[in-house]
Amino acid sequence: MIRDFHAHIYFDADEVEQARALGDAAHERFGVPVGHYHLRPVGPHPRGSVQLTVPAEQFGEVAQWLAFNRGTLIVFAHANTGDDLADHTDHVIWFGPSEPLDLSIFD
């Protein structure tokens, strides 16, 4: 069962403001919580990122909006089922090119 989705907006140092603008716009439009802006890789993520937590029933609408409003940013989205490894490998959607994740944290 899917509890919710995470949409991680990836960014480099020169894209922080663009990522903040996208996160703020998603929060204003959909009311989704926006997490901390990590300026360095954290968890399995290969570079700076911020997490949007999206209710399952709202994900379709938010995903469509992110696909058309992300600009040049990459967004990694995944379901939250309780199986962290599967959620980060099998239950994923990439908006933009995919990037390798550090899956060793799930060992």
Question: Which role does the model predict for each range below?
Answer:
Residues 1-107:
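Long, contiguous binding/interaction regions
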